[in-house]
Amino acid sequence: MPKHGKKYRKATDGTDLAVRFSVEDAVAKSLEASFAKFDETVDVAICLGVDPKYSDQMVRGAVTLPNGLGKTVRVAVFCKGEKQAEAREAGADIVGAEDLVEQVKGGMLDFDSAIATPDVMALVGQIGRVLGPRGLMPNAKTGTVTFDVAKAVSEVKAGRVEFKVDKAGVLHAPLGKVSFGPQKIAENLKALLDTVQRLKPSSAKGTYMKTMSVSTTMGPGFKVDPNDIRRFLEG
């Protein structure tokens, strides 16, 4: 059983972490339990009733959070011609095609998100083994393979979150910073859950959102009552 430090134990003192809370209470308690000296990120983990080993039950997508993520995101755009000017005007930090691919091959990974136009995806495929494991590979399902680079860059800069269910059927996503306060975090969570709900596979049986937990970077996870998730979505 993992040992926790004094600050963690103090943050959870008097709290039964086995209890399941309403969505709003889980968010509020996770913020109250934050004890790090830095502005921690608030995260959510959602266990979905899907089996990712079947391609038709893979849940993957993206959502632009209404209150952003509270951090500066560096964006790289792989494109050619006039699209390069569009990307720069939209605020892209790094823009290029063959030259950018060569830089990445050389070890340059100074960006948090990557976007590509469809006509250069064969080129970007050369660095798939570098970008893929880091979650940086552009993908049409998440809107990062598109000719509308200006829109894509703007959305990423505004707080666009990409998510993908893991092998265990769990989806992880950031919701912002502790300094946002409970209302803004709850609003971001609502936007995420609405999107995840819309992506429910038709082949998924039984309860879709089975369990959910909200936590901060260093803090404990507060579990949500599964019955309250539906109430929160409909509210």
Swiss-Prot record:
Transmembrane segments: none annotated. The keyword Iron-sulfur does not apply. GO terms for cellular component: cytosolic large ribosomal subunit. One of its GO terms (biological process) is translation. InterPro entries: Ribosom_uL1_bac-type, Ribosomal_uL1, Ribosomal_uL1-like, Ribosomal_uL1/biogenesis, Ribosomal_uL1_3-a/b-sand, Ribosomal_uL1_CS. It comes from the Bacteria. GO terms for molecular function: rRNA binding; structural constituent of ribosome; tRNA binding. Keywords: Repressor, Ribonucleoprotein, Ribosomal protein, RNA-binding, rRNA-binding, Translation regulation, tRNA-binding. HAMAP family: Ribosomal_uL1_B. Part of the 50S ribosomal subunit. Belongs to the universal ribosomal protein uL1 family. Binds directly to 23S rRNA. The L1 stalk is quite mobile in the ribosome, and is involved in E site tRNA release. Protein L1 is also a translational repressor protein, it controls the translation of the L11 operon by binding to its mRNA. This is Large ribosomal subunit protein uL1. It comes from Oleidesulfovibrio alaskensis (strain ATCC BAA-1058 / DSM 17464 / G20). The gene is rplA.
